[in-house]
């Protein structure tokens, strides 16, 4: 099997050296070249024709985002962004994902060498995922048209969504058309701390419904979406007649915290047939067992189809496990989940 050919673009010589060490330590990949800036990278891409590009977000001579935008227009290829953990870094990274980057890794704030080498397996996994990702599914999506407001539903109704690689854009596409009369949505997207708040704030500006990073103990309200905070699990719990959110630091599940399975299992238990479960693009099997539990508890469950997924991992696992009622294209997810949640009952509250 041929090796995954990687090109790293970073203005830091140390980072280029570390990335080279990491990539070359894996037998299935090789660093074919490195570049200190996008202008040099342009020539190296033509020369070496890499399978995956790792790209520093903030660089001199040409901004990483400007370069990414041009690259995706002229020569689309899988890109993994390398980002700082700052507020600005998370904003820029989210924009990069919108422009077509497959995924990102964060630079440790202290001890770059030790920190990056500790990320060795994660970086390799993200490069492997990027090499297999569907670029056709990751073309920048146009804003979906707003769905008509349906009847107000019982506050017992809610939607649970899980996603990973490619999920930030898929979630935007699902939430943007939702009317204010939508039920509450609980969302687990695999993301590090610091990024989930920026992600929620970004969606809040784009959507009619309110979108926020979830807080422990807060009441779950219709017309709002709650994003699990990075590195913490989110569960649905009850307080009397009301739903509320439970945030905790339990151990990683399926190597993830937050974990989609943790959310889905809690929704199966607390909401049962009053819920709809949705599993979107992502690598691995997180969410498959939880989605089966939701289906067995009477919930309607949807999986994104392969053609519209950046990575058809999590949906495939959920389908194979028997947890999925219906497989739909990303463009139909919003409409279908609202139709299914409304089919049960329409109670004015």
UniProtKB/Swiss-Prot annotation:
In the record, which positions carry 4-aspartylphosphate? Answer: 56
Encoded by which gene? cheB
Q: What is this protein called?
A: Protein-glutamate methylesterase/protein-glutamine glutaminase
Per its UniProt record, what Pfam families does this chain match?
A: CheB_methylest, Response_reg
Q: Which residues form the signal peptide?
A: none
Organism annotation: Escherichia coli (strain K12)
Which PANTHER family does the UniProt entry name for this protein?
PROTEIN-GLUTAMATE METHYLESTERASE/PROTEIN-GLUTAMINE GLUTAMINASE, PROTEIN-GLUTAMATE METHYLESTERASE_PROTEIN-GLUTAMINE GLUTAMINASE
> Phenotype when inactivated?
Mutants are defective in chemotaxis. They exhibit very high tumbling rates.
Q: How is its activity regulated?
A: Methylesterase activity is activated via phosphorylation in response to negative chemotactic stimuli and is inhibited in the presence of attractants. Activation requires both CheA and CheW.
Q: According to the entry, what is the taxonomic lineage of the organism?
A: Bacteria, Pseudomonadati, Pseudomonadota, Gammaproteobacteria, Enterobacterales
Give TM segment ranges: none
Q: Does the keyword Membrane apply?
A: no
UniProt-recorded Gene Ontology molecular function terms:
deaminase binding; phosphorelay response regulator activity; protein-glutamate methylesterase activity; protein-glutamine glutaminase activity
GO cellular component terms, semicolon-separated:
cytosol; plasma membrane
Q: Where does the CheB-type methylesterase domain lie?
A: 152-344
């Amino acid at each position: 099997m041929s090796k995954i050919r990687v090109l790293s673009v970073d203005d830091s010589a140390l980072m280029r050296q570390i990335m080279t060490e990491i990539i070359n330590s894996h037998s299935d990949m090789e660093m074919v070249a490195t570049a200190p800036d996008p202008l040099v990278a342009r020539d190296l891409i033509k020369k070496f024709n890499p399978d995956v590009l790792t790209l520093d977000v903030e660089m001199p001579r040409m901004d990483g985002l400007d370069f990414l935008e041009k690259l995706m227009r002229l020569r689309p290829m899988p890109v993994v962004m390398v980002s700082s953990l700052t507020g600005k870094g998370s904003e820029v990274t989210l924009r990069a994902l919108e422009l077509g980057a497959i995924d990102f890794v964060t630079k440790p704030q202290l001890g770059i060498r030790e920190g990056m080498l500790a990320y060795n397996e994660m970086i390799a996994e993200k490069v492997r995922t990027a090499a297999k990702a569907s670029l056709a599914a990751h073309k920048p999506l146009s804003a979906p048209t707003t769905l008509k407001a349906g009847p107000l539903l019982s506050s017992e109704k809610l939607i649970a969504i899980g996603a990973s690689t490619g999920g930030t854009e898929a979630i935007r596409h699902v939430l943007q058309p939702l009317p204010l009369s939508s039920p509450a949505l609980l969302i687990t997207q695999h993301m590090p701390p610091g990024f989930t708040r920026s992600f929620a704030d970004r969606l809040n500006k784009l959507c009619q419904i309110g979108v926020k990073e979830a807080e422990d103990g807060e009441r779950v309200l219709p017309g709002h979406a709650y994003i699990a905070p990075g590195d913490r699990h989110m569960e649905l719990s009850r307080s009397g007649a009301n739903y509320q959110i439970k945030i905790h630091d339990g151990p990683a599940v399926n190597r993830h915290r937050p974990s989609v399975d943790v959310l889905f299992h809690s929704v199966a238990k607390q909401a049962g047939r009053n819920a709809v479960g949705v599993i979107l693009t992502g690598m691995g099997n997180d969410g498959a067992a939880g989605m089966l539990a939701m289906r067995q508890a009477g919930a309607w469950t949807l999986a994104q189809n392969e053609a519209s997924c950046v990575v058809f991992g999590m949906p495939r696992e959920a389908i194979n496990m028997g947890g999925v009622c219906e497989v739909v294209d990303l463009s139909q997810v919003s409409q279908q989940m609202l139709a299914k949640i409304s089919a049960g009952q329409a109670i004015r509250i």
